Amino acid sequence: MDTEGFGELLQQAEQLAAETEGISELPHVERNLQEIQQAGERLRSRTLTRTSQETADVKASVLLGSRGLDISHISQRLESLSAATTFEPLEPVKDTDIQGFLKNEKDNALLSAIEESRKRTFGMAEEYHRESMLVEWEQVKQRILHTLLASGEDALDFTQESEPSYISDAGPPGRSSLDSIEMAYARQIYIYNEKIVNGHLQPNLLDLCASVTELDDKNISDMWAMVKQMTDVLLVPATDALKSRNSVEVRMEFVRQALGYLEQSYKNYTLVTVFGNLHQAQLGGVPGTYQLVRSFLNIKLPAPLPGLQDGEVEGHPVWALIYYCMRCGDLLAASQVVNRAQHQLGEFKTWFQEYMNSKDRRLSPATENKLRLHYRRALRNNTDPYKRAVYCIIGRCDVTDNQSEVADKTEDYLWLKLNQVCFDDDGTSSPQDRLTLSQFQKQLLEDYGESHFTVNQQPFLYFQVLFLTAQFEAAIAFLFRMERLRCHAVHVALVLFELKLLLKSSGQSAQLLSHEPGDPPCMRRLNFVRLLMLYTRKFESTDPREALQYFYFLRDEKDSQGENMFLRCVSELVIESREFDMILGKLENDGSRKPGVIDKFTSDTKPIINKVASVAENKGLFEEAAKLYDLAKNADKVLELMNKLLSPIVPQISAPQSNKERLKNMALSIAERYRAQGISANKFVDSTFYLLLDLITFFDEYHSGHIDRAFDIIDRLKLVPLNQESVEERVAAFRNFSDEIRHNLSEVLLATMNILFTQFKRLKGTSPSSATRPQRVIEDRDSQLRSQARALITFAGMIPYRTSGDTNARLVQMEVLMN
């Protein structure tokens, strides 16, 4: 038959070739072997495409058919579905067709509502996604910023420095990361907070911190003396620190305090110099500033300098005596010199008396203009540097002249310029006779800067320059960048913060030192929260108690999301140090809570514990989170997390000190305590928790070989059917179980089937019949076991849950072996 078919096909091909050759109009095409191969490949690919589609259909039929699904029926249903009737354009209706009009209006309203709901849903999803991204990015920014070494350009300065990073390696466990000075500061902070939380009178934090200074470190002692002097001001009532700090009264007070500090320091310097050279100083006469300055000049100016004018008083130049008396802050002593030499000084005595008796050391405008005119005409190029300096101070003129012959040290330069600072803008002063505090601050911070003051060799000098010009934030930020001086900078910031003198950044993502829009040009803000968190990061893992004391200063601060910074820092501290019991307290066996360190700072600890528990939960630390929620009496969250922890370990074999044994004991302890105290949680979560405990007991009995006890447990739980009549009931009940129960279904089914199969083998292994067990009883039991196995198979096939193919195969295999 096949031979005849091929012969007929050959005959037709030859006939077709003959007919084609007979047509002369058509050109004759000859193909080479490569072209024939390509054409064959094209035909083959078409055939394979059709064949592969058919093969895929066959495979789909086999796969779905094994689950009881008819693929042809599904295909027909899918083809019959059409969206045309739902979204097709509405048919036009006549004006008089009321029914059609109403139907169209109804359909239009439905479609509009659906479209509006769709747009609103997508919009809400986009908004939620955007907010989530912003919050996450804000957290990432915080972590990045907290690792930067400094603010501004210094943050990206890669020059070699000997200073270590903020984040130093933690020492061995149990060893403090605080050095002796830092520990001494921490003790004073503890004393301060103890007074605050106990409701006592607020102590002076500045005095507490100043008591820490090392006896042999004069720089630190001088620093705290300067801080005490500069903060001893009366603040004007204002809504915030910026308005208070920017008021004219407070700025004038800062300048007065700075001058007082510089004058007292210089007087102390002259005392030390004189008493160190008593023979040369020839100290004598009535004790006081005048005699002190006279003796000091015996050392400083042993021989008269050329160019000094207006004679001498007791062998010393007049203007030098006046200048150094003023430099020591004693205008009465300077007045004494003026009175002795009044005949050589002309009108100066009158001007000096007015200057000395004025409230703000300021001449009247008329007198000031007269003195300035005299200075410009007769004294600008005078050869006596002391005379020029005194006139520039009293008349506040020629501010561009630094008087370097007299003010040869930084402290002298500061004193001279602060004396020339003016606050009232009468509009009559020329630029060379006017120096504002803002101009002077800008000159020191931006024009001169750190490079001018050789900060690596003299860090305290630059700190002093900034602090005495009321640039507290810039001074603190500078000192904080030096590892060995960081603790001092932090505690100066704490003192200013408590005195309401610190200008804080409005957001925690700002640099350590920043300038915000709307602030005066010379004003800088300090990121106080970041400063404190960077400082505590060094020791929070080894000294969490001390870190907590510092975080208490943030109790009224909030982050960009409005979250309390004290709560946030405590939660991060607890997670980082894992000192849950010590900081937050511990739950005793009777359910009472043993107080922790946090109880000293607040009477209501639940919000803090719940916050820490939430952070632990978000980090995946479910076991710690469950304990913390238990500490906060949040039963719903405790059982919810315990369900997540218990679900994976339910079918595991128990072993001493294993993960399952630990979690089981923890769960049993919670269950016993909740039942004894009558604590209940959400009904669904509660029932899941106790069902998981029962399943753990079931598997423990099963793995121990106590199959009869295990069978009794699974029978009482009513989780799987053990007869055909209860299959549908169990399938319906299965829909109400949580995922924690469903995930263990495969193991429960296999264990139950194994129990039935073991009982079946044991039944078959007994003698055929006996007086106590007749043959009929054995047959009934055999039938019952097979029926129970069949019920399990039916249940596994009907539940709306995908079990593994291996589970189904093993279930079927054991059921077949029983038959």
UniProtKB/Swiss-Prot annotation:
It is a peripheral membrane protein. GO terms for cellular component: centrosome; nuclear envelope; nuclear membrane; nuclear periphery; nuclear pore. InterPro entries: Nucleoporin_int_Nup93/Nic96 (IPR007231). It holds the Pfam family Nic96. The modification Phosphoserine is found at residues 52, 66, 72, 75, 80, 430, 767. It comes from the Eukaryota. The keyword Transport applies. GO terms for molecular function: structural constituent of nuclear pore. One of its GO terms (biological process) is nuclear pore complex assembly. Keywords: Membrane, mRNA transport, Nuclear pore complex, Nucleus, Phosphoprotein, Protein transport, Translocation, Transport. Coiled coil: none annotated. It is found in: Nucleus membrane; Nucleus, Nuclear pore complex; Nucleus envelope. Belongs to the nucleoporin interacting component (NIC) family. Plays a role in the nuclear pore complex (NPC) assembly and/or maintenance. May anchor nucleoporins, but not NUP153 and TPR, to the NPC. During renal development, regulates podocyte migration and proliferation through SMAD4 signaling. Part of the nuclear pore complex (NPC). Component of the p62 complex, a complex composed of NUP62 and NUP54. Forms a complex with NUP35, NUP155, NUP205 and lamin B; the interaction with NUP35 is direct. Does not interact with TPR. Interacts with SMAD4 and IPO7; translocates SMAD4 to the nucleus through the NPC upon BMP7 stimulation resulting in activation of SMAD4 signaling. This is Nuclear pore complex protein Nup93. It comes from Bos taurus (Bovine). The gene is NUP93.
